[in-house]
């Protein structure tokens, strides 16, 4: 890694520390937390952070595949919303408790998200729509249709509670002190995340498809010249973003056991944070996953701080911790190089 890039990535750590120090210094009551806060960071906290990492990291990795292909998909938030709503709606329709129903609900959510991503791809690739506007449309449509669907089905924007995913302990490993319950006694979407991160890196960097995908976003004309269909590559990249968001949205919803449609819905900006993670990670799935865990960890921390008895801190103030950290870290990271042809339409006849 060259010196400027190393310096920029080191700024991420510095930014995180400064953000936390700022909160500690500015918020009355934080200085008195002391040992209570230290006690929060246990195996249960790590499991909670990993659960919250799932939608952010999968959205971030999905965004990498789309943008590397040359299509900027800022509709990740909308895809997560569609997936979360579909998962709970199908789970509720099937009775809401058994493992088979959860599996069906999970796949239904992935299919729904991938279908919306396909429509987005068609609008952008075939009809050459502005990708930013189309992505915003996906988000706004999802933000309206999911709560509306909730009202139609349940007569309220929030669904009734359904079953939640059980943790799956791995024999022997789950019994290790601290690390065992934190990493090896988690739910299926978290295990999927552990597999998806190295798989995504390998797919992007060590396969012919990955090379074609990156060429599609850097120099589609050259890729077309050697006989590779740029349209198909871009469709595949966007569809992968839909599949990944489907996994992330379904994972969050089925871990929660309810769809919350009020306000920004239960997704609550995680798709937007997913975009920042791959910018921070410079379009590297591993970097995006690490950034996702950092922000999810802050999210989990603010939830724990609100729960601790005796700490009188505004829940609204504590809730902005992850978003303040996003701004600080992005400031320290600086410019990230986008694919040269990202956002540009390609017509082989031109």
Spans of features found by a protein language model:
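Cytosolic-side transmembrane-helix boundaries in multi-pass membrane proteins
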Residues: 1-27, 225-232, 305-350
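Transmembrane helix-bundle core of multi-pass membrane transporters
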Residues: 143-203, 309, 313-314
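Single transmembrane alpha-helix segments in multi-pass membrane proteins
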Residues: 43-106, 110-111, 116-132, 279-284
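Helix-loop-helix "hairpin" substructures at the membrane interface of multi-pass membrane proteins
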Residues: 185-260
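Transmembrane alpha-helical segments in multi-pass inner-membrane proteins
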Residues: 259-323
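Membrane-interfacial amphipathic/re-entrant helices at transmembrane-helix boundaries
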Residues: 1-58, 72, 86, 98-100
């Amino acid at each position: 890694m060259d010196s400027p890039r190393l310096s920029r990535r080191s700024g991420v750590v510095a930014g995180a520390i400064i953000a936390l120090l700022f909160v500690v210094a500015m918020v009355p009551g934080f200085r008195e937390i002391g040992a209570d806060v230290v006690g929060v960071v246990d195996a249960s906290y790590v499991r909670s952070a990993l659960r919250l990492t799932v939608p952010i990291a999968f959205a971030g990795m999905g965004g990498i595949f789309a943008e590397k292909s040359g299509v900027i998909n800022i509709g990740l938030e909308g895809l997560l919303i569609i997936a979360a709503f579909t998962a709970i709606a199908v789970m509720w329709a099937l009775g809401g408790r058994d493992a088979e129903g959860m599996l069906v609900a999970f796949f239904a959510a992935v299919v729904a998200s991938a279908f919306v991503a396909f429509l987005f791809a068609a609008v952008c690739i075939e009809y050459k729509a502005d990708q930013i506007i189309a992505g915003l449309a996906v988000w706004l449509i999802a933000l309206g249709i999911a709560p509306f669907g909730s009202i139609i089905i349940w007569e309220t924007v929030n669904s009734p509670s359904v079953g939640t995913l059980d943790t799956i302990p791995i024999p022997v490993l789950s019994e290790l002190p601290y690390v065992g319950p934190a990493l090896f006694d988690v739910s299926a979407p978290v295990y999927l995340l552990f597999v998806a991160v190295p798989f995504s890196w390998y797919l992007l960097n060590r396969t012919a498809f990955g090379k074609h995908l990156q060429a599609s976003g850097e120099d589609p004309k050259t890729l077309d010249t050697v006989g590779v269909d740029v349209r198909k590559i871009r469709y595949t990249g966007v569809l992968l973003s839909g599949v990944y968001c489907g996994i992330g949205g379904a994972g969050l919803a089925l871990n929660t056991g309810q769809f919350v449609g009020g306000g920004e819905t239960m997704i609550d900006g995680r798709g937007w944070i997913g975009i920042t993670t791959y910018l921070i990670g410079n379009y590297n799935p591993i970097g995006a996953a690490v950034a996702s865990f950092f922000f999810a960890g802050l999210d989990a921390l603010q939830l724990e701080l609100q729960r601790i008895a005796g700490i009188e801190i505004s829940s609204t103030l504590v809730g902005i911790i992850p978003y303040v950290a996003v701004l600080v870290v992005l400031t320290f990271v600086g410019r990230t190089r986008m694919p040269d042809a990202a956002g540009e339409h390609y017509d082989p006849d031109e």
